[in-house]
Each structure stands twice: as C-alpha cells, then as structure tokens.
C-alpha cells in the first residue's frame, strides 16, 4: 500500500510587515515558538512529517511513503494537487491512504481530525438599474430596492438539512456596493458578492439553479457569475482513520473527534483517487487565517 503525505508551502499574504514582532519570513526561534508566515498553515505539518520519517527505519516498513507538496493551495489551486491527481489517474496509479497536515486541532494537538470538507461556491451579481434624482422616483430604477426581496429570499432559503457528517449549507454575504456617495442620487448598478459552503446533500449546480430562479422570479435585470471552487468530499473512516485515532489516544491519552468542518483543502482533489483521507495538524490559533488575520503566525 501507498501512504501519501499531502502538504503545501505557499502562504497567505503577510499584511503590513511592521505589525509583526519578527520578520514574517525569518523563521525566528524565540525559545517557545518558531515565528513566520505559514508555520501553522502548513509548513509546520510538513516539518513534523519529515521529522517523524527521520526517526524510523523506512526500509523495515511493509508499505511505501510518498510526498505530494504543492505551492498552489492558498490561491486558485489550478496548477498544484489537481494537476498531479489528473496525472495519477491517467497512469492508473493508486494511493491507498493520505495524511494532510492542515490545521485541525481545537485546543490540544490531536483533539480533532477531519475526514471531509464542505464545498464552496462564489457568486458575483450585478443588479442593473437606472440612476436618477431621489426627488423624482418615477424616473429612476433603484437597484438597491430591487435587490431587497431577492436578498430576503436568499437569506431565508433552507438549502438543505445537512446530514450526520455535515452541517446544513450556509450562506454569507461578503460584499455589497452601490451609489455615488450622495444622499439624493440613486445608483445605476449594485454589486454583490456572496459565498455558500455546502454539504454533500446539494451540488454547486443545484445552488446555481436556485439563485438564477430567485433572480428570475423577482424580474431583476442582472449579470451574474458562478465559481464552484470546491466540491464537498467525505472519506469513509476505515483502517487508516482507526490507526490515526488509536495513535492519538496512545500518545495524547484522549480520544479524538472526527469532523468535516472548516474551509476547503486539497483533500477535495486527492479524494478523486479513492484513497482514505485524514487531516491532522496544529491548533487553529497558530496560523493567520484563524486569528482574525492578525500578524505573528507561529508554531511551537
């Protein structure tokens, strides 16, 4: 059998570097933490796996170990793991187990592992109207007024009920822009961005169809684009998951929990090989994405 460790070395932007206590790319060791961008997500996970390998006699193992390290995970993820998986499928090369070092811990390392992730769809909408003076309502076509009933439908919609592995699909409005900044001038157009994180109970295509039907039912003139940037995946816990759970209990002294929470990961690509997947990594608070985009990414 083949066990693959999947990781990424690309990182999110640092933000203002003067807000960092240490140079974000120095890897500064303060005696307690290694400081630097990407230590938690997820260079630390890669370092841990390499360190573990250096302490065992790999020649004595009855299975093979591989590394799949990408530099295209934080961004559009168009040329990283997805391309490797396409090549592996073409070659009919089989991966049996995959360990992903993404941050998964809530409080104490190992208290949570992931065996799935929700899907994600980004939607950009432009509502078309007609600009005019607020004193002459008959001469304007206010896109803000037009979008309100659409938003009401959108926010009240029960997309699904979730299931035993996934919470119900959720929606968040992330950007809305309209107007020229004056009190007495209505906007010409309105721009809206929103995101849905969806379970295995619904597809990205079904969400797209619902949104388009809402727009049609309200008679809204519009331009809309959809980007299904991640499909949900679920890895049925079997032998590998059992081994990871037992190892955590042996080392840490507690039973871990299994979840499908969090954002997207490259697990969505590697899952297409049919391998069993476990995501196990450091505490959320060690990396920028989970500390309100603050500086001082660090890992002990």
Identify the meaning behind each predicted range.
Residues 2-66:
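Active-site metal-coordination/substrate-binding segment of hydrolases
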Residues 151-159, 232-277:
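Active-site-adjacent substrate-binding region
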Residues 134-177, 185, 198-223:
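Acidic-enriched catalytic cores of C-N bond-cleaving enzymes acting on peptides and small amides
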Residues 39-40, 44-53, 57-153, 289-292:
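Fold-level recognition of mixed alpha/beta catalytic cores in primary-metabolism enzymes, strongest
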Residues 30-40, 254-259, 287-289:
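Short pre-catalytic strand/loop immediately N-terminal to key active-site residues, enriched for Gly-Thr
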Residues 290-300:
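Single conserved hydrophobic/aromatic residue that forms the stacking wall/gate
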Residues 171-179, 195, 199, 223-241, ...:
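A short beta-alpha structural unit
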Residues 107-114, 158-159, 175-181:
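Glycine-rich, charged/polar anion/phosphate-binding loops
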């Amino acid at each position: 059998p083949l066990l693959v460790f999947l990781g990424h070395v690309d990182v999110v932007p640092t933000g203002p570097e003067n807000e960092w206590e240490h140079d974000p790319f120095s890897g500064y060791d303060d005696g307690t933490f290694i400081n630097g961008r990407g230590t938690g997500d997820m260079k630390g996970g890669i370092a841990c796996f390499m360190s573990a390998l250096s302490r065992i006699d790999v020649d004595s193992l009855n299975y093979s170990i591989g590394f799949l390290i990408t530099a295209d995970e934080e961004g559009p993820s168009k040329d990283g793991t997805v391309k490797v998986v396409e090549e592996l499928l073409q070659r009919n090369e089989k991966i049996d187990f995959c360990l992903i070092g993404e941050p998964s811990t809530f409080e104490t390392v190992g208290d949570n592992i992931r065996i799935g992730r929700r899907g994600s769809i980004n939607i950009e909408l432009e509502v078309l109207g007609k600009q005019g003076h607020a004193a002459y309502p008959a001469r304007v076509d206010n896109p803000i007024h037009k979008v309100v009933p659409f938003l009401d439908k959108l926010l009240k919609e029960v997309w699904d009920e979730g299931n035993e592995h996934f919470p119900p699909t959720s929606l968040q409005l992330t950007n809305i822009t309209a107007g020229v900044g004056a009190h007495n001038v209505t906007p010409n157009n309105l721009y809206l961005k929103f995101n849905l994180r969806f379970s295995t109970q619904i597809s990205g295509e079904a969400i797209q169809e619902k949104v388009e039907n809402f727009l049609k039912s309200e008679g809204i003139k519009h331009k809309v684009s959809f980007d299904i940037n991640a499909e949900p995946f679920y890895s049925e816990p079997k032998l590998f998951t059992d081994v990871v759970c037992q190892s955590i209990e042996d080392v840490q002294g507690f039973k871990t929990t299994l979840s499908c929470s969090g954002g997207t990961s490259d697990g969505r690509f590697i899952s297409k090989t049919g391998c069993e997947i476990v995501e196990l990594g450091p505490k959320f608070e060690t990396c920028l994405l989970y500390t309100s985009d603050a500086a001082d990414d660090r890992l002990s």
